[in-house]
Amino acid sequence: MTNKELQAIRKLLMLDVSEAAEHIGRVSARSWQYWESGRSAVPDDVEQEMLDLASVRIEMMSAIDKRLADGERPKLRFYNKLDEYLADNPDHNVIGWRLSQSVAALYYTEGHADLI
């Protein structure tokens, strides 16, 4: 994975550098910035986890696409705060929250869903 690909996926998932560094790379934010700048190579395990998260996002989108195909206009929860998300999803973490935000924002901005 190139540095630009890493940054593109991180931004698509709505993760900031510190969140990605802590929860995916388990490194300092500075190390993550080195990967994104191209100063250091992206480790294979980080590449795989980012690709896995992008796949999870696609699965989430597929579930919404099925609802749309059935004629439903989904109402998607957009959590402003991590604490709100965790109250409804206690087994998740910041990564799940950001994935949820990413998908909800996409469908809302494309006019396919309402946010609640």
UniProtKB/Swiss-Prot annotation:
Effect of residue 45 to A: Specifically abrogates RNA-mediated translational repression; no effect on transcriptional (DNA-based) repression
Binding site residues for DNA: 34
GO-annotated molecular function: DNA binding; metal ion binding; RNA binding
The keyword RNA-binding belongs to this UniProt entry's keyword annotation: yes
Superkingdom as given in the UniProt entry: Viruses
Keywords noted in UniProt: DNA-binding, Metal-binding, Repressor, RNA-binding
Pfam families in alphabetical order: Aca2_YdiL
Binding sites annotated in the UniProt record for Mg(2+): 92
Function: Represses the expression of the acrIF8-aca2 operon. Regulates the transcription and translation of phage anti-CRISPR acrIF8 gene (AC H9C181), which is necessary because the expression of this gene rises rapidely upon infection to enable evasion from host CRISPR-Cas defense but is probably toxic to the host cell. Aca2 repressor can inhibit acrIF8 transcriptionally through DNA binding to 2 inverted repeats in the promoter region and translationally by binding conserved RNA stem-loops on mRNAs thereby blocking ribosome access.
Assembly behavior: Homodimer.
Domain notes for this protein: The N-terminus HTH domain is involved in DNA binding and inhibition of transcription. The C-terminus is involved in dimerization.
Name of the protein in question: Aca2 repressor
